[in-house]
A protein has these predicted regions:
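Binuclear metal-dependent hydrolase catalytic cores
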Residues: 1-172, 191, 248-284
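Active-site flanking residues adjacent to catalytic metal/cofactor-binding acidic residues
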Residues: 41, 72, 174-175, 202-204, ...
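Cap/insert and terminal regions of metallo-dependent hydrolase folds
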Residues: 181-269, 273-274
Length: 284
């Protein structure tokens, strides 16, 4: 199982030399499992860049794109890549999206409402490829060889966290996770998703000082991510969903601070995600 990151920012994209090393695109990563179609996780602006890569692959093979995506929630920074995903505009292409059903309407209703005039020039029905949606709640299912566990996690609006297992390896993904005010309590669903995984990709958007002013904004601190990882017996922690205001230097400082925490000693590796990073989890 191999994981490649195409977007690691939260809230909105950013650009400029001060953000170059970590990258400015919003949440999108791709899991490659030998013999399976690509498994995309979140559909932020990084999806456009992945579309460029995938277009070259499918054109070399002479076959249309078939892929599956896991969508945590419907905030703009997690869906903005959809209309700019090049392969989805090719005849015969198919993208199946598993994501949270909504209190009023379906996942399909919500996505179609977000991609239509006047906010986008065409309706999603006019894409030449096919986008299939599957509403998901607290359930387990399979995508190819991957076993997927989906559970609701605290955030603003209906939001899922995912655990993916394949090739005897496991990862948990919680890009948007509201830390509790005490920053110690861990919800049972979160522990279930994270328990003993090889890699935890976790929201680390705020510093402790920022969290003091934004405790109800739906996100975590790097310190809380370390706490979750240590309590769940995670092997490796990767901080993600970086705040768009945090420069490369600031993200380095946040990471160094996280690594100095006493609980970090219980984790094999604590790092921060960056665009174009690829992690090979191998096979058990």
């Amino acid at each position: 199982m191999n994981v490649t990151f195409y977007g690691v920012r939260g809230s909105c994209p950013c650009s400029g030399d001060r953000y170059r090393r970590y990258g400015g695109n919003t949440s999108c990563l791709v899991i490659h499992i030998e013999g399976d179609e690509p498994l995309i996780v979140d559909l932020g602006t990084g999806l456009r860049a992945y579309g460029d890569v995938l277009n070259k692959e499918v054109r070399a093979l002479g076959t249309p794109m078939h892929a599956t995506a896991l969508l945590t929630h419907l905030h703009f920074d997690h869906i903005l890549g959809i209309p700019f995903f090049g392969p989805l505009h090719d005849p015969g292409a198919r993208l199946t999206v598993y994501g949270p059903g909504q209190p009023k309407g379906t996942l399909k209703d919500a996505l179609h409402a977000a991609v239509q005039p006047p906010v986008f020039p065409i309706h999603m029905e006019q894409f030449r490829g096919e986008l299939i949606t599957v509403d998901v709640g607290a359930e387990d299912f399979s995508v190819g060889q991957a076993k997927v566990m989906a559970r609701p996690i605290p955030h603003a609006g209906v939001t899922l966290g995912f655990r993916i297992e394949a090739d005897g390896r496991s990862l948990a993904y919680m890009s948007d996770h509201q830390a509790p005010v005490d920053r110690r309590t861990i919800p049972d669903n979160v522990l279930e998703l994270c328990q003993g995984v090889d890699l935890l990709i976790h929201d680390g958007q705020y510093t402790d000082d920022e969290f003091a002013d934004k405790a109800d904004w739906g996100h975590s601190t790097a310190a809380y991510a370390v706490h979750v990882a240590a309590e769940a017996g995670v092997r490796r922690l990767l901080l993600s969903h970086h705040d768009p205001s945090h420069t490369d230097r600031e993200l380095d400082r946040i990471l160094n601070g996280a690594r100095r925490l006493p609980e970090a000693k219980l984790i094999e590796d604590v790092s921060s995600a960056h665009e174009a990073q690829s992690i090979d989890l191998g096979k058990a």
